[in-house]
Amino acid sequence: MTKLKQERGIPMERKNQKSFITTDDRLDKIKLEDASVRDVAEAFYYGNDSYNYNLDVLVSGFFNKSSINKYETNFSKYKHTVLQITMPDFLASLGFQKTGEYNPSHGNKIAKATKESKDIEGIIYQFYDKGLILYNHTQDKNRKLIIEISSWYDKTGYDYSIYCNYDIDNNILLNWENYTKANNPYRGKKIDGSGEILKLNENISFDSIVLPDKMLKIIKDNTLKFFGTTALLSQNNVNLKRGIILSGPPGNGKTMICKALANEVNVSVLYVLPSNLQQTTDVNRIYEMAIELSPCLLIIEDIDFMTMDRDNFSGDGRLIELMNKLDGIEEMNGVITLATTNLVDKVETAIKNRPGRFDRVINIPLPDIDLRIEMFKKFLNNADVDYEVVAEKAEKLSGAYIKEICQTAKLLAIVNGDIDSNNLAIVNDDYLLEAITEMSDKDFSQAKKYIPKNKIGFEVSRIER
């Protein structure tokens, strides 16, 4: 055996085993006669990594069912996916190598393993990627981890199996949580509030947004440049969490800014919609995700739906929870909360313009004539039209409306046969003015009946004629 171990590079001294692994009689349970296979067993026993057993994973009775189900229920798809991805790797990092089988044809899905010629099976309650199966024993009351190295052929052609048992440590779930903090597969990814990968339009960038340069600089300084200088900020005792509110009428580019930032930042992005924050516990869940994924840009659209002024609102536990999170009761270094609202005057005063919560409120007003000219040029690819005239006619219209006017003008050109040799619409002043008149006389005037005067520019669906 010594010679074989030396030939295969197996260390003479046993490596330190994990405290929750029992190994006293491990080799005695391996009934193998052939030296080469026994040597494989010793390599496995001493933790040698030079052998690739190509095993699946079967965990038997690893957690009690209630604890793991409660854990996943509290964290929705996000934690479920993190568990799927990290648990097999976590076990492998501890030296666990396991195999078994499961029978999906059975109504309850039965997992099976073999322990010293005794079949063990249990009802599966979780089945994960990479072959990880969690189930409860039905025939063996001891909480054991069954390890089987199957289909190992020695040079004589015989098939051997190696069986070993581990006692399970009660703290292993906590150890796994610590493991995921360093190996979270979502870190650096762009996800939504339920843990799904975002499908962002990669063409949206700050180059596609028409806003005053000064305003864009403020936004970039508090987001892109902030994430790029965290080490320097920390050295100078600058708070490494930020809260920013983008306010203004609908259609003025708030969501476009959020999407551009999501595309351009090189950190994790968590994009949250009102549907992701229905309960107080959802606020806590979202911020736990952001902290785990930090550095992270947390985008919350339409934050006014849960932060209404308490003088005019009966109260909402979500508001209190949000204030607690922003106050930094928990460490939130590296988390920027970027929120949007069309109704900033309705947002609770204790939230907005409050250092430590939302430090900046950036108002994005309706575009002035210079910005409207720039928008028309951008949306029309510098077509030969009188931009000052059409921009004046589009007074008090948002960027979204101006874009719609340009789309309508192109449609009018196409249906009238005004296209160039490259099949591109030839837009002229008449088409633009007709589009503006069509919108102003019908859709826009109808919209103004149902919205406050200070919300002119509110986006409404085009009225069918």
Identify the meaning behind each predicted range.
Residues 185, 228-231, 295, 327, ...:
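Generic structural signal for secondary-structure transition and capping sites
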Residues 169-176, 257, 375, 405:
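Hydrophobic side chains in well-ordered alpha-helices
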Residues 62, 175, 179, 222, ...:
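Residues that form generic nucleotide/phosphate-binding pockets
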